[in-house]
């Protein structure tokens, strides 16, 4: 056996710096089941600041790059860009049937990741939000016993300094590595890469405003000295070199559908929440869900609430047709308790801020069904969200915010729902259109206390965009709007949307 040391011939190093800013609450759990909440935040043991591990960043970037190159739900192979940039996996699914001798030979050729990703500690001690979650029984519409949980979240605006370093060896494809790095950096800049848990329900959205990039050619003495003397823990000068002459030739293979729908509140809305974000500690017994955004705490509709409502209405539609719920499970994900089989949801629902609202306290009392009188000591107060009309004086004070917009439907808008479906099938689009219709006509309320008329919406405008990579990244756009109670939609869009619903009927 040879004792000769095998070294890598590194010819270039690329250092990338940026600041990651959270756009929505993010759950970076430490997995401690004995904490004050069911999911505690991962913190630095010395400074008590939030910790973002390098493995979490690498996993998110690797998954994004793989989906960009190969689309969703595709197995990874050692020839993919993700394997070249982030290193080989322990085993590949397409190599399971190979002989042991062949497997051993392939493993000897495995390479580690040329991209070094540092762990990151938040710039400040983070602001923390507490969220409650509960599982709902689809038959009764009530909460299941012993299925409530709570978790800690990093609030929006938390910042993490990022540092990557790409090592380019003489025998590696430099252009391919630079293209792969450019794709993930651009993905972070566009806010298309999420981190942490529950990303499919609106958590973990983030972005990087600007990247600083330094490229060192180690075959040159000056660059070699510059890399050795580079200040790694202080403030660096502005980058003097960019990823030059890098043209992203890789086609985006992701097949995805986006639905953006604007609604106004017809009735008050109440999504119950704890009171840790309410400034008035003498607040009512029940308050609406708030979340921190730039400028203060804002009322929001959580992605989990919207997804749960859509999920149960989709089950109702399919059951009405007396068919199997496989379509719903494939769309919203499932967990089989017996076989332990599970699948993640392909439907991504964003958390949205509720605009143009006011908060009023309403007193209620429980009634004795036997006597018809009030229960003693059963008086309670709730503080739902009410739609508020924008006053003319406010418009004059802030002309930029309320300036005339060609999209007149937005002046009464309270909620803008954003939904993304990965790898959509035509019949699944038809099901989503039926769900959108129920929301549009106030037939599908969201939130709690819907039995007393709360949570009903009225549609104002909807935009549907389908990026279909199966047809060369074809972009298909459809729109629906409302004007004085009349639905506005072109004949072409009407026929196309009706086609999707017909496909659903054929499928079930």
Task: List PLM regions with ranges.
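Small/polar/charged residue-enriched interaction surfaces, especially the RNA/DNA-contacting tracks
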Residues: 1-508
